[in-house]
């Protein structure tokens, strides 16, 4: 069962890393090119759509699944794999969930008060929002990638431990 948790952990974490990477490299720079009014309007839409059960399952699954994989590895006696999976969960909790809840969500709530009309006001508001939001999204991107790498290493260690034991090696 722990291998199912590893696969789900890798999938959820990779999907989140891809989302954050896309925002860092495509979405935010693209919104900047479209002008402040368009950018504010688009982010209003994105912030509405993101509040979905499917997104929540994947977003929080990237925390829960590594913990379940760590528990499974630990129960199987694969301490190294358990530690790496636990580290992945810790990194994800701090760099992705923590940053999201402490920085990006409050910025999104501020953005919700911006109106689409009034280009001059929107230009100042967008600049005030987009810079910090993008910077902290880079942190989330790097955190998700680092958590993903820890999970890959954890699964490799777990699989290596299984293979070593099947051949009578310690």
Give the location of each predicted region.
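Short, charged juxtamembrane terminal tails flanking transmembrane helices
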Residues: 160-170
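Structural signal for membrane-spanning alpha-helices in multi-pass inner-membrane proteins
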Residues: 20, 66-73, 100, 151-158
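A hydrophobic membrane-anchoring alpha-helix module
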Residues: 141-161
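Hydrophobic alpha-helical transmembrane segments
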Residues: 56-67, 145
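Membrane-interfacial loop-to-transmembrane-helix junctions in polytopic alpha-helical membrane proteins
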Residues: 1-5, 47-54, 77-84, 126-139
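Hydrophobic alpha-helical transmembrane segments of integral membrane proteins
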Residues: 87-109, 168-170
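Interfacial loop at the N-terminal end of multi-pass membrane proteins
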Residues: 15-60, 106-131, 168-169
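Interfacial segments of alpha-helical transmembrane regions
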Residues: 1-14, 71-97
């Amino acid at each position: 069962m722990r291998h199912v948790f590893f696969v789900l952990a890798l999938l959820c974490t990779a999907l989140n890393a891809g989302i954050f990477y896309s925002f860092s490299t495509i979405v935010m720079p693209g919104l900047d090119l479209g002008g402040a009014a368009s950018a504010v309007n688009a982010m209003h839409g994105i912030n509405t759509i993101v509040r979905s059960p499917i997104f929540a399952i994947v977003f929080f699954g990237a925390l829960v699944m590594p913990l379940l994989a760590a528990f499974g590895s630990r129960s199987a006696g694969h301490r190294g794999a358990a530690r790496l999976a636990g580290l992945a969960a810790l990194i994800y909790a701090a760099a992705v969930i923590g940053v999201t809840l402490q920085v990006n969500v409050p910025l999104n709530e501020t953005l919700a008060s911006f109106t689409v009309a009034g280009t001059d006001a929107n230009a100042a508001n967008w600049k005030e929002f987009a810079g910090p939001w993008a910077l902290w999204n880079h942190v989330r991107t790097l955190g998700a990638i680092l958590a993903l790498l820890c999970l890959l290493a954890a699964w490799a260690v777990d699989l290596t431990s299984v293979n070593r034991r099947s051949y009578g090696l310690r």
